[in-house]
Amino acid sequence: VGEREVTSVAIFDRDGTIVDVVRDEETGAVTVAFHPDQLRLLPGAVEGMRSLAEAGYVLAMATNQPAPAKGQFSADAVRRTNDALVERLSREGVAIAAVEACMHHPQGGPGGDPSLARACECRKPKGGMLDAIVARLGADRSRSWMLGDSVSDVQAARAAGLRAGLVFADNRCELCPLRAGPVGLAPDAHGATLAELAGAILRRG
C-alpha cells in the first residue's frame, strides 16, 4: 500500500487579504463587501494565490462575517458574495477548495438574527473554521498556513496548529509590532501583499 499523500493547505482571510474593504465616500466609514459588485481584488492577491497553488498548496478561505448577527445585512448576502468571489478567482485560474464563514457575533445587534448572536468556536481568533477546513481536506497542520491581515488571523493559526502569514502595509501601524513579537503572535512570514507573502512562504521551503 502506497503512502497517503499529505495535503498542504493555504487558508486565506477574505477582507483586507484577498479583497479590499469598502469605504463610504461621504462618511469615510469602512465596511466589507456584501454584494458581488463591491468585490475588488487587492494588488498581488491573484499572483500570490497562484504561486502557492503552483507549489502544491490546496487553497481555502476562512472569514468572519458577523453582519447577519448584527443586523447589517443578510446571511444570503454573505453567501452570494463569497460564491461570487470563488467564481471570480476561478476565472483568474485560482481554485478554492473550501470556504468557511462565521456569521456569529457574541452580542449581535438590532435587527440581527438572534440565533447567530452567541459565542462560538468558529469565530477567529478561535480556530474552529481552520479545524473544519483541515479535517475536510485531510491536511497536514504542520505544513499548512493561515494567511490574513489581522492579529485574530495569527491567533486563529496558533489555535489550530498552523503556520501564520500576515499581510500588512507600512501604514497599518497597529500591526507593526507583530513583526517582532509578542511571543506567540509574531507571524512565521509576512509581506505587504499576498504576492510578497507567498514569496516569503515559498522561500522558507
Predicted region positions:
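Metal-dependent phosphoesterase signature
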Residues: 18-43, 65-77, 91-92, 113-121
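Hydrophobic residues in well-ordered beta-strands that form the structural core
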Residues: 20, 61-63, 166
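Acidic, Mg2+-coordinating phosphoryl-transfer loop and its flanking beta/alpha structural elements
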Residues: 145-189
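Active-site flanking residues adjacent to catalytic metal/cofactor-binding acidic residues
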Residues: 12-14, 63, 148-149
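Substrate-recognition element of Asp-dependent hydrolases with the DxDx(T/V) motif
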Residues: 45-88, 92-108, 157
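Conserved Lys-Pro-Asp/Glu-containing loop-to-beta segment of HAD-superfamily phosphomonoesterases
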Residues: 113-154
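Structural recognition of alpha->loop->beta junctions
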Residues: 82-101, 177-203
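Active-site neighborhood of HAD-like aspartate-dependent phosphohydrolases
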Residues: 2-58
